Amino acid sequence: MINKKSNASTPLEKAINAVGGSQKVLAEKVGVTPQAINMLKKRGGSLPVTKMRKYEEVTGLPREVLYPGIFAA
């Protein structure tokens, strides 16, 4: 069986794992609803640029990890 948590591939999955693996916790820390996080997941797992600093702050992950399409790692 494949463990998807250890192989987070989308920026959203990486952010969720960084806060303990909970979409609800990530939503609370970022200041959005759990439904908003679920919508991001359904749309491919990219994070909104408008909340870039907030995602960096709450996850402790650098923008190069959270926004690989914008910043080269």
Swiss-Prot record:
CDD domains: HTH_XRE. Residues 23-42 bind DNA. GO terms for molecular function: DNA binding. Keywords: DNA-binding, Early protein, Repressor, Transcription, Transcription regulation. This is Gene 30 protein. Residues 12-66 form the HTH cro/C1-type domain. It comes from the Viruses. InterPro entries: Cro/C1-type_HTH, Lambda_DNA-bd_dom_sf.
